[in-house]
Amino acid sequence: MAKTKGEKRNKSAINEVVTRECTIHLAKRVHNIGFKKRAPRAIKEIRKFTEREMGTNDVRIDTRLNKHIWSKGISLRYRSTPFRVRVRLARRRNDDEDSPNKLYTLVTYVPVPTFKNLQTENVESSDD
C-alpha cells in the first residue's frame, strides 16, 4: 500500500537506549584461523556481532571481557579461545559533544555456569 500524505513515520528503534544479554558462539567464528590469531579475531568478531545486533559503529569492549577472551592466551599449550561467551550489550548515549556518533555500545562479560537454554533477553538497564 502507498502511504498517504498525512501519515507519520515511526521512530527508529536504533535511537533508543537498550540493554540486551546475548550468547556469542565464538568457535564457529574463529574456525580455520591460525592459533596465534584466534584471540584477536575473536575480539574483532565480537565487535562485528555487536555492530550488527545493536546498530552502532562505536563499540567499546570491557576489560573483563578482553581478559576472559585472552585467558587461554596464544601459547601452544591451550591454543584456543572460549567456545561461547555470554555478553551484555548496552547501547548508551555518548556524552562527548565532538563525537560523530550519538550512541555507543558497551560490551561486558557475564559469567554463566552453563550455556544450555539461554536466549537473547532484554535487560532492565541500570545506569552506573
UniProtKB/Swiss-Prot annotation:
Disulfide linkage: none
Gene3D superfamilies, alphabetized: 3.10.440.10
A single BP term in Gene Ontology: cytoplasmic translation
Domain of life: Eukaryota
Coiled coil: none
Swiss-Prot/TrEMBL keywords: Ribonucleoprotein, Ribosomal protein
InterPro entries (alphabetical): Ribosomal_eL31, Ribosomal_eL31_CS, Ribosomal_eL31_dom_sf
Gene Ontology CC annotations of this record: cytosolic large ribosomal subunit
Keyword Ribosomal protein among UniProt keywords: yes
GO molecular function, one term: structural constituent of ribosome
Family per similarity comment: Belongs to the eukaryotic ribosomal protein eL31 family.
Protein name in UniProt: Large ribosomal subunit protein eL31
Naturally occurring in which organism (per UniProt): Drosophila virilis
